Amino acid sequence: MEREKVVLAYSGGLDTSVAIKWLMQKYSLDVITLTVDIGQGIDLNEIKNKAENLGVEKAYVLDLREEFIKDYIIPAIKSNAMYERVYPLATALSRPLIAKYLVKVAKENGAKYVAHGCTGKGNDQVRIDLGVKALAPDLEIIAPVREWNFSREEEIEYAIENNIPIPVSRKNPYSIDENLWGRSIEGGILEDPWQEPPEDIYLWTKLENKEPSYIEITFEKGIPVKLNGVEKDLVGLIEELNKIAGSYGIGRIDHIENRLVGIKSREIYEAPAALVIIKAHEALEDLVLPRELAHFKRMLEDKYAELVYYGLWFDPFREALQAFMDKTQERVTGKVKIKLIPWSFSIVGRDSPYSLYDHSLATYDKGSTFSTESAVGFIKLFGLQNYLYALKGGKNA
């Protein structure tokens, strides 16, 4: 009798490596692995070979970097998406894409199940489960880590007993997730919010340059298209900016985060390009968007980031907000100058053909065209409701 199939989102790390053997032993399933390239910067063929050596039926490796950029990172840039105004959502943005291809590979192979290595405490379980169910309600989801309740130590023991090669040891107990948009590090000493993260956990943000320098990012309709005047595809631009900003130690985030499941967690991120691009994009929007639109957009950005963080990428609310965000970007074209110094950066210049900044109106020097005489009438009308309220006794009525 032919065994049922399961498609496992496979990273090559501890959880999913253990999950391959566990799914075979516990559920008697034929395992198909799916590994996606979203800019991890590692040899994915090695991961494919590892999966095959563990006895999987098929091992898929898909290069999804362009799709990740086009359909997930660009919408996030347009929305200045930062959960709790701190975290640029690198991991959260990748999960709906992974869910999409879990469904696709499952359908192609007639699999009844999909599986992932998310824990029962984290946000990723929600993101992938909701993504899969939004696209294929008929598929069943197995989350081995939620079921087996292994501690990190017990997982390592299981791997050793089953001859599973893993990149984690008792001396290096970190769980790392990485893509083009950012890198996250969890576990070990980092779980103590009082302890300073050891320097050796950082890979992208090491202080190598101490002399200040300037970079320039050019945007077209909200999308970065040039770095220092040189046109680049966004994959290349992000990769180069990660290196440039990261060499100043820029991009480290140490954050107490409110997880969707109700707990607080200590999260360490590296996101040099993401932080610089979003701040530059905000600065350009400040120059070209009318005040009311700019203010309202900032409010919606927080909700947008929450929806992405919560795993509601395919929700109609997120899609409706995206339509609004896209509309706001029609004039977000121009360039932004950024100064880089050790451990920090600042916006020091911005220019756009759609700039609403008018020097002749804004200047306090001689020659200003602003009509100060009009201010008296404006103030009277603007404050008319408060004036009438005060006449009727105001707060003392």
UniProtKB/Swiss-Prot annotation:
Matching Pfam families: Arginosuc_syn_C (PF20979), Arginosuc_synth (PF00764)
Keyword terms of this UniProt record: Amino-acid biosynthesis, Arginine biosynthesis, ATP-binding, Cytoplasm, Ligase, Nucleotide-binding
Pathway(s) of this molecule: Amino-acid biosynthesis; L-arginine biosynthesis; L-arginine from L-ornithine and carbamoyl phosphate: step 2/3
Enzyme Commission code: 6.3.4.5
Residues holding ATP: A9, Y10, S11, G12, G13, L14, D15, T16, S17, G117
UniProt key word Transit peptide: no
Classification via InterPro entries: Arginosuc_syn_C, Arginosuc_syn_N, Arginosuc_synth, Arginosuc_synth_CS, Arginosuc_synth_type_1_subfam, AS_cat/multimer_dom_body, Rossmann-like_a/b/a_fold
GO annotation terms (biological process): argininosuccinate metabolic process; L-arginine biosynthetic process; urea cycle
Family annotation (PROSITE patterns): ARGININOSUCCIN_SYN_1 (PS00564)
Cell inner membrane keyword on record: no
GO cellular component: cytoplasm
Catalytic activity, as annotated: L-citrulline + L-aspartate + ATP = 2-(N(omega)-L-arginino)succinate + AMP + diphosphate + H(+)
Sites where the protein binds L-citrulline: Y87, N123, R127, S175, S184, E257, Y269
A GO molecular function held by the record: argininosuccinate synthase activity
Leading EC class: ligase
Subcellular location: Cytoplasm
Residues engaged in binding L-aspartate: T119, N123, D124
Matches recorded under HAMAP family: Arg_succ_synth_type1
Family statement drawn from the similarity comment of this UniProt entry: Belongs to the argininosuccinate synthase family. Type 1 subfamily.
NCBIfam families listed in its UniProt record: argG, PRK00509.1
Assembly notes: Homotetramer.
Protein name: Argininosuccinate synthase
